[in-house]
Each structure stands twice: as C-alpha cells, then as structure tokens.
Design a protein with these regions (language model features):
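Solvent-exposed, charged helical/coil patches
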Residues: 1-58, 107
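Basic, amphipathic alpha-helical patches used to engage nucleic acids or provide basic targeting signals
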Residues: 36-40, 46, 62, 67-135
Length: 136
C-alpha cells in the first residue's frame, strides 16, 4: 500500500494528512491509536521526547495506523518505523507475530527497527544514534 498525501486547506495554512490504511481500517484503528497515545509506557514516553528534539531533524508520529497495525513511531518521510518492545515481546507467539508484522511492513517499503524498553530507558544516546544512522 502506498502512502497517499492529501492536502487540505485549513484556514491560511495548508496541512498534510497521511492516509496509510484503507479508510475503513484507518477509522477503526485511529481510535485505538488515540487511546494508546494516552497510555504510553515509560519507554515510549522517553523515546517520544527524544524524537521531538530538534537534534532528530525529522518529523515523527506516534501510535500511527498503517495497514492492519498501529506502529509505535513512524517517520513517514523516510518510511522508518520504530517499535519499543516490552517484556511480552520475548514470548514465542509474540515473537512470531512481530516477525510477521515486520515482514508485512517491510514488504510495504518500510524499514522497521526495534528497541527494548530497557534499551530506551538505559541507553537513550545509543538509541538516538541508531535512529539517526537509519535516517541518513
């Protein structure tokens, strides 16, 4: 699925809205995404603060619907998805689900990188450096 960029005139400014799922799926997932934004983990909050810094130089969205998924973070311009994995991602079934999810998103042209909660919280500089390398 391609990313469609639709521009709409919002007063004097023109803003961009990104459609990354079918309209029906997007409308369903956006409600879950909104809820997720209000209940972020400590690691997700920490990474969001990193991604919002001017040092990052690219715009990221958090809890964004793509296809059948809600990704933790995405830079649409660079087609980079960042997932922050909690402890349950070490469970065999979740690892298989994550593999399928990553493969599906990769087949759609996205690069998916993953960090554990511990990596984000204990090594934020390393996480930022890794993200910057992926963006360049």
């Amino acid at each position: 699925m391609a990313v469609n960029i639709l521009e709409s005139n919002m007063g004097k400014d023109v803003s961009q809205w990104f459609e990354t799922a079918s309209v029906d799926r997007y409308n369903l997932l956006k409600e879950y995404a909104k809820e997720n934004r209000h209940h972020m983990t400590d690691a997700e909050k920490a990474l969001w603060n990193i991604l919002r810094q001017p040092k990052c130089s690219y715009k990221f969205r958090r809890q964004h619907p793509i296809y059948d998924y809600i990704v933790d973070f995405i830079c649409i311009e660079k087609k980079l998805i960042i997932e922050v994995d909690g402890a349950y991602h070490s469970e065999p079934q979740q690892q298989e689900d994550d593999r399928i999810r990553t493969e599906t998103l990769s087949n759609m042209g996205y690069k998916v990188i993953r960090f554990t909660n511990e990596e984000v919280l204990s090594n934020p500089k390393v996480v930022l450096r890794t993200i910057k390398e992926e963006l360049s």
